[in-house]
Amino acid sequence: MIPEVSINNQSFPIFSNLNSNLDFIKVKTAALVASSGTLLDNNFGDEIDKHDLIIRFNAARVKGYEKYVGSRTDIRILNGHAFNGSTKKDICLGHDPNFLTTLENETFLVKSYNVQEFIEGVMKYINKNPINFLHPNFLIYCNNLVSKPEASAGLIGVLLLVTLGIKPDLYGYGFYSESNDKVHYWEEVNSNWSTGHGFDEEKNIIDDLYKNNLLNIIK
């Protein structure tokens, strides 16, 4: 059964489809591992791996960074444009020819954008992956909380688990530390690079959830 959320007296499903491999009912502890370079400041890997559920986002790497970010990924939340056309050009995400093949044991949870390209890439490289899609109405709910065009995958992950009644531990959400200015812990990103997300607004949303004891922020 696909879980629903009720907001302003309206109910709608969280997922467009839900494969049987996604069983949130049994989850007691969950780690949302974001992509900030602040993750390199601490060896949280073993702590992260102890969670029942570990969620990562987009192109976040694990291999070579296990002591910082853990070694397991249960769900990877992906923007529909996360592959940036690479799945059609035989060039894998992040210019790493082996990256897609390292994801073969992960479950994908996808925002409903550029879906055809995404599925073509998955079927070509790693067709064992279960693919699930967030419902457009749930995405609209998330996007309406910010003034930018769309909420980040990191915020969507937070709202997803909180909506499901799961209190997550947040790792690597960069706006909680200034000790490392790398946007992504595994790569150098141009200082002029813009995500198009409103992280100040997103921080305020997450702060409010923290104040209401709905999540933990691990620094």
Question: How would you label these PLM feature ranges?
Answer:
Residues 1-219:
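Metal-ion/cofactor- or nucleotide/acyl-coenzyme-handling active-site neighborhoods
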